[in-house]
């Protein structure tokens, strides 16, 4: 007997699907236009290599995100009409699917909610001219108010956020363009700090940051694919919403940070908000407020997805209660400053979902480019592949020498290939359980 999350699953009919430019492309582009993507991008990239190297990294990273992390999940969604937690039951099993990708997606969404709450709070306080520092009373008060409000909207009124999400996504794009023109004059004067010059590190860190940021969204390509009409929608939605969006949403901030440092040699820090502060005046304050407002969809959707993941995989848990409980954890991570370290969080996300995407890709290809169907019990081929890939993905956190750590990035990419290869080998060795029938 199948669990409820499979027994009650109904494929999305073709009549409810839409073209790529109405759903997939703008939704994915909105993910990359979120401030969390590029806030700390420059500090680990253009400090080690020139803009040409970093732009090459953006191009390659965007194509890798599209081809490796998005395409197979999206095609599975297109062909089945089912969301990620259903199609994942092939790679991880009917019982195994509870945890991966089901509950794991919910847990990581709490982390994303914390990130969204942290930066919205930080930018609101900076816009008000108030000292912004985690673990202080103003930061805690603003973080709790923002987090609780967004969690409630995510639990009870997500449909209203969906209606304005595309409009709000246009705000950061406009801000990126304005900041670029404000700083463009200094781009030619930017020079990589001589003591840190290492193009290899610049290129690999660009890949690591982009792929780590995208990993969960790539697996969620299943949910976008189930809303696509055909393979062309899947391809164009990914190429425009992912590959092109990475270049625009990553490239403009890199140019802006480089330009700001070229024009102001005394500028401290390579975070994107350092550039906004350097612009100064009412313009900077307005920008901080607008970036915070543009974080509304991300905060609400993270809360909604987390609650939905928990309530779907554990039906006895009410969705609103699980949403608010997850939000409470996220708020704590935000106001204490834990959520401020984006690069480390991206690495964890890449380590968690890189091998999931890799194992799913192997399963898809071994099954003749189709969904095999749910597999009985736990698919240990999937779990072992994930564990091996996760270990590879967290290598940057292990006590390795600085020289070795130079070569462990992009760990998220290596974790994908580890998951792919290990799953393929174990599947060939007969470790995949038998397929069980879905209800008609």
Identify the meaning behind each predicted range:
Residues 1-55, 65-66, 198-207, 226-233, ...:
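Membrane-interface "cap" regions at the ends of multi-pass membrane proteins
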Residues 29-34, 60-69, 104-114, 171-182, ...:
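Selective recognition of specific alpha-helical transmembrane segments in multi-pass small-molecule
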Residues 58-92, 101-111, 115, 428-431, ...:
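Juxtamembrane transmembrane-helix boundary signature
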Residues 27, 31, 102, 130-155, ...:
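Transmembrane alpha-helical segments of multi-pass small-molecule transport proteins
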Residues 18-35, 180-186, 194-258, 281-300, ...:
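Hydrophobic, membrane-embedded alpha-helices of multi-pass small-molecule transporters
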Residues 141-182, 197, 238-242, 346-358, ...:
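Membrane-interface loop-to-helix entry segments
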Residues 358-440:
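C-terminal membrane-solvent junction of multi-pass transporters and transport-like membrane proteins
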Residues 42-74, 96-101, 242-247, 414, ...:
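Extracellular loop-to-transmembrane helix junctions
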């Amino acid at each position: 007997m199948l669990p409820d999350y499979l027994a009650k699953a109904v494929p999305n009919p073709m009549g409810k699907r839409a073209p790529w430019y109405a759903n997939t492309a703008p939704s994915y582009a909105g993910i990359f236009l979120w401030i969390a993507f590029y806030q700390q991008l420059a500090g680990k990239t253009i400090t080690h290599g020139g803009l040409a190297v970093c732009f090459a990294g953006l191009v390659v990273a965007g194509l890798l995100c599209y081809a490796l992390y998005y395409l197979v999940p999206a095609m599975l969604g297109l062909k089945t009409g089912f969301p990620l937690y259903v199609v994942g039951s092939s790679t991880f099993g009917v019982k195994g699917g509870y945890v991966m990708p089901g509950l794991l997606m919910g847990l990581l969404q709490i982390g994303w909610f914390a990130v969204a709450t942290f930066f919205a709070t930080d930018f609101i306080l900076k816009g008000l001219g108030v000292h912004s520092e985690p673990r202080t009373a103003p930061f805690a008060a603003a973080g709790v108010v923002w987090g609780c409000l967004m969690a409630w909207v995510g639990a009870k009124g997500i449909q209203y956020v969906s209606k304005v999400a595309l409009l709000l996504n246009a705000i950061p794009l406009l801000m990126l363009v304005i900041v670029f023109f404000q700083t463009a004059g200094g781009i030619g004067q930017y020079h990589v700090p001589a003591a840190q010059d290492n193009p290899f590190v610049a290129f690999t860190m660009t890949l690591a940051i982009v792929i780590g940021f995208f990993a969960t969204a790539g697996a969620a390509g299943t949910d976008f694919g189930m809303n696509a009409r055909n393979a062309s929608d899947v391809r164009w939605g990914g190429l425009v919403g992912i590959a092109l969006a990475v270049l625009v949403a990553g490239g403009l901030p890199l140019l802006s940070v480089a330009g700001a440092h070229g024009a102001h040699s005394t500028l401290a820090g390579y975070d994107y908000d350092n550039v906004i502060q350097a612009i100064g005046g009412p313009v900077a304050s307005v920008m901080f407020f607008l970036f915070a407002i543009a974080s509304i969809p991300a905060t609400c959707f993270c809360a909604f997805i987390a609650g939905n993941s928990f309530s779907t995989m554990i039906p006895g848990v009410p969705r609103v209660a699980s949403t608010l409980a997850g939000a409470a954890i996220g708020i704590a991570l935000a106001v204490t400053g834990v959520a401020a370290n984006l690069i480390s969080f991206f690495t964890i996300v890449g380590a968690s979902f890189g091998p999931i995407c890799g194992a799913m890709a192997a399963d898809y290809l071994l099954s003749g480019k189709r969904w095999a169907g749910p597999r009985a019990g736990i698919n240990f081929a999937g779990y072992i592949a994930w564990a091996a890939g996760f270990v590879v993905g967290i290598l940057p956190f292990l006590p390795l020498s600085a020289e070795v750590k130079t070569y462990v990035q992009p760990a998220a990419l290596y974790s994908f290939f580890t998951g792919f290869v290990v799953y393929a080998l174990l599947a060939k060795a007969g470790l995949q359980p038998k397929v069980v029938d879905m209800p008609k």
